Amino acid sequence: MLNHVVTRFAPSPTGHLHLGGARTALFNWLYAKHNNGKFLLRIEDTDSKRSSKELIDSIINSMIWLNIQHDGDIILQSSRISRHIEIANQLILNDKAYYCYCSEEEINLEKEEYTKKGLHYKHNCIWKNRNPPIGNCSKVIRLHSDTEGITEFKDKVYGTIAVNNVQLDDMVLLRSNNTPTYLLSVVVDDYDMGITHIIRGTDHLTNTARQLLIYNALGWKPPEFAHIPLIHDENGNKLSKRHHALGIHEYKNAGILPEALLNYLLRMGWSHGNDEVITIDEAIRWFSIDKVGQSPARLDSKKLEFLNNHYINATNNATIIEMIIPIIEKTIGYKVNTEKIGYLLNGINELKKRTKNLVNLANESLFYVEDIPISFDQESLIIIKSNHDILSILYDNLSKVLNDDWNNSTLTSMIKNIVKDYNTKIHNIYHCLRASIIGRINAPSIIDIMVNFQREECLNRIKYARDMVK
């Protein structure tokens, strides 16, 4: 266990929290928890045009739903702009940065020349070692970058990473409108927050090299870095906010349990032997960066379905019902009464065994809680319309069964007698019972359902179905 570990998650509220961001948050949180450290949350909201309060709330709510809990107060990067400006000016005073008076037009022309020559663009500022022009000219602050040698750091996933300094230009630290750039703000915030370890995607590798130049210019000790491979879709294509990547709120709305999604994210690039189902307590106990692979992780919808089914079945029935009742009530348009919830509580175990998600489970549970008239699928309607006589026979015979005798043995025996007495097929009887009582053919044991519903509910449903085709 390491001493004094502080990690952070620093999303930009230009979109909802998606899988890649959630996995980054999870890995940082687990690393901090494993080492008895702190996990901080910073919202990088300095892009005022694309950031919004709604997206900030969405990110925070998604993390609450996932139960990834941060320590201390949430830090808004926009509240620290004066500190970022202070550091930029400090770099000027220490001759680690300079004012660049090049116009946007001049820079664009310079880029075009590099493109024509097929060269990697690197700005060569004519003002780097000159006196400023006369008058009130627009300017930016740029870092004095070393054009020789390499910038090297040890990554906890990929080992030693070396970037040729020729590729790193004199990056802008402060724009002409006096707003700090991402590269400067992140370094200042991470330093002030005491961040010791940064875990983020490999798409930040170049940013890390650039940020190390800023750390060096300021004489600050940088944190340790771990870059985790990106997540690809099932076809091996890179996920992004704009393509393929579902927001965490969409997984929630699709009926995925947070425990299942966390387990799924955990296994994307990290492993513990052959274990697939890993509880959050086990994850905290076992997590280490050296078990993160270097290859991109791929989405696997079948694995997510498997994990979700596992956690649904591991959750007690009362809790699951509490989760699906709002979905059911939205579907049927009225409040479910307490007696019907009792039916569902008695029968939900069989439904849980084969469900993929809570939405699917809610739909499969409708017949338990619907008032008459219940909903019928197309196959059930066809059976009902073509079996009026059988439904009448079932109603008449079942009406003779007393409440005290309404059990599995009596009902099974009566159905066998009906098959014999009326020269019909047993599967036809069961189809008619399913169609009239639950509105569909594919379902758990209809006898068990009838015992659960008890006499009056079953007779009322059969009577309604019979009378539909008078």
From Swiss-Prot:
It is found in: Cytoplasm. A motif ('KMSKS' region) lies at residues 238-242. Belongs to the class-I aminoacyl-tRNA synthetase family. Glutamate--tRNA ligase type 1 subfamily. GO terms for cellular component: cytosol. Catalyzes the attachment of glutamate to tRNA(Glu) in a two-step reaction: glutamate is first activated by ATP to form Glu-AMP and then transferred to the acceptor end of tRNA(Glu). A motif ('HIGH' region) lies at residues 11-21. Keywords: Aminoacyl-tRNA synthetase, ATP-binding, Cytoplasm, Ligase, Nucleotide-binding, Protein biosynthesis. One of its GO terms (molecular function) is zinc ion binding. ATP binds at residue 241. This is Glutamate--tRNA ligase 2. Its EC number is 6.1.1.17. It comes from Ehrlichia ruminantium (strain Welgevonden). It catalyses: tRNA(Glu) + L-glutamate + ATP = L-glutamyl-tRNA(Glu) + AMP + diphosphate.
